[in-house]
Amino acid sequence: MKRLAIPLAALMLAGCGLQPMYAGGSHGAVAQGLASVEVAPIEGRAGWLVRNALRDKLSQGGVQADPRYRLDVLLNDKLEGLGLLTDETIGRERRTLRARYQLVDLASGEIVIDATAGSDAGIDVVSSEYATIAAEETALENLSGVVAERIVTQVTLALRAR
């Protein structure tokens, strides 16, 4: 029964039109397209973190092609206090990182994507100021990776459609 189930499942999947996103590995069209995306400098510490994460994710195979696209990113990094305690101190913070980005075709100047991505994280404020600052920085590092991953996903979908 199992011997029949696997080929049957393969036939059913082939009929539904699903195709692997990264077909062809590092030599496939999507991987080559991602490798041809140049990330413009992004302002600030959050910008440095997001840009590095984007560059890592866009050239995962180590292949760097001549730039065909430019990715412009504007960030909004906000840290706000929440949860007032009885002694009027803040007990919790929320760090929000939002990105507005555009993928520009360098040959034509056409904007391929104009979108936003973002994420947020909660931070406990503790009595140690050092621990709180460390938690804020860790949250920024984690959010940078999440936002970069969301941007790369949308860029991948747009390049695949082209």
Where are these regions (language model features)?
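Post-signal peptide N-terminal segment of mature Sec-exported envelope proteins
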Residues: 25-45
